[in-house]
């Protein structure tokens, strides 16, 4: 469980630290910092919605739903009994990222984003957006943790594949 809590707390700490830097050096100055021209920049944004900035739910409902999901992830990780490093790592990243964004939602009602890859612009669900959104460390941790669950499913949950069930979903 140390690995779970180490990653959870590390993600929260790194997320909070980098968001504060983004506020100071990007929001307060109104500047965007180009790292790789035409590809990657540090660009300040505040996101009231969920993935890709979509606002499907009222902020209060989104806050409650996010709290329930993050709590469920933590409870599942604590009581599941699986102590494999990949299990603890993936759920630690997901929980840490969820808490990092939840802190923003509780304190300001929106999530601070600042990492931007300019990969493609177009329409998604009828709304024009940069199809690669501006995101943050918490989002990255959630995505990496979820990808770990998919890629290493058989190693994280060996009992489910040993019984002949190859279905992930």
From Swiss-Prot:
<feature type="active site">
    <location>
        <position position="139"/>
    </location>
</feature>
<dbReference type="InterPro" id="IPR001872">
    <property type="entry name" value="Peptidase_A8"/>
</dbReference>
<feature type="active site">
    <location>
        <position position="113"/>
    </location>
</feature>
<dbReference type="Pfam" id="PF01252">
    <property type="entry name" value="Peptidase_A8"/>
</dbReference>
<feature type="transmembrane region" description="Helical">
    <location>
        <begin position="84"/>
        <end position="104"/>
    </location>
</feature>
<comment type="function">
    <text>This protein specifically catalyzes the removal of signal peptides from prolipoproteins.</text>
</comment>
<dbReference type="GO" id="GO:0005886">
    <property type="term" value="C:plasma membrane"/>
</dbReference>
<dbReference type="GO" id="GO:0006508">
    <property type="term" value="P:proteolysis"/>
</dbReference>
<protein>
    <recommendedName>
        <fullName>Lipoprotein signal peptidase</fullName>
        <ecNumber>3.4.23.36</ecNumber>
    </recommendedName>
</protein>
<comment type="similarity">
    <text>Belongs to the peptidase A8 family.</text>
</comment>
<dbReference type="GO" id="GO:0004190">
    <property type="term" value="F:aspartic-type endopeptidase activity"/>
</dbReference>
<feature type="transmembrane region" description="Helical">
    <location>
        <begin position="132"/>
        <end position="152"/>
    </location>
</feature>
<keyword id="KW-0997">Cell inner membrane</keyword>
<keyword id="KW-0472">Membrane</keyword>
<keyword id="KW-0064">Aspartyl protease</keyword>
<keyword id="KW-1003">Cell membrane</keyword>
<keyword id="KW-0645">Protease</keyword>
<keyword id="KW-0812">Transmembrane</keyword>
<feature type="transmembrane region" description="Helical">
    <location>
        <begin position="56"/>
        <end position="76"/>
    </location>
</feature>
<comment type="pathway">
    <text>Protein modification; lipoprotein biosynthesis (signal peptide cleavage).</text>
</comment>
<keyword id="KW-0378">Hydrolase</keyword>
<keyword id="KW-1133">Transmembrane helix</keyword>
